[in-house]
Amino acid sequence: MIQMQSQLEVADNSGAKRVQCIKVLGGSKRRTAGVGDVIVVSIKEAQPRGKVKKGDVHRAVIVRTAKDVRRADGSVIRFDSNAAVLVNKNEEPIGTRIFGPVVRELRGRGYMKIISLAPEVL
């Protein structure tokens, strides 16, 4: 679960390394976000000459969480860290590559571009 002030790794080559959640989208009282949800993030650490720079505000889709993701068949999947992919207003990825595995639940949310760029879908 991701909430305001949560720090996440960036799993793409947009130039950002670390981001902080500043808003969970999807309702005025919504406090937490899980895999496949869109959040608003501030870039806290970035690579030089990247597409984004420190201090920028962007939207991001959560692709990995340390909190369990429960599947319909009863299985559970979790990761060591929280990670997100930066997206634009149309929810298309800013980067051209995705690093690390992503969860299958993104397919049901309509993020086929992220699924196709990912090296592994769990």
Swiss-Prot record:
GO terms for molecular function: large ribosomal subunit rRNA binding; structural constituent of ribosome. It holds the Pfam family Ribosomal_L14. InterPro entries: Ribosomal_uL14, Ribosomal_uL14_bac-type, Ribosomal_uL14_CS, Ribosomal_uL14_sf. GO terms for cellular component: cytosolic large ribosomal subunit. GO terms for biological process: translation. Keywords: Ribonucleoprotein, Ribosomal protein, RNA-binding, rRNA-binding. CDD domains: Ribosomal_uL14. Part of the 50S ribosomal subunit. Forms a cluster with proteins L3 and L19. In the 70S ribosome, L14 and L19 interact and together make contacts with the 16S rRNA in bridges B5 and B8. NCBIfam families: rplN_bact. Binds to 23S rRNA. Forms part of two intersubunit bridges in the 70S ribosome. Belongs to the universal ribosomal protein uL14 family. This is Large ribosomal subunit protein uL14. It comes from Sphingopyxis alaskensis (strain DSM 13593 / LMG 18877 / RB2256). The lineage of its organism: Bacteria, Pseudomonadati, Pseudomonadota, Alphaproteobacteria, Sphingomonadales.
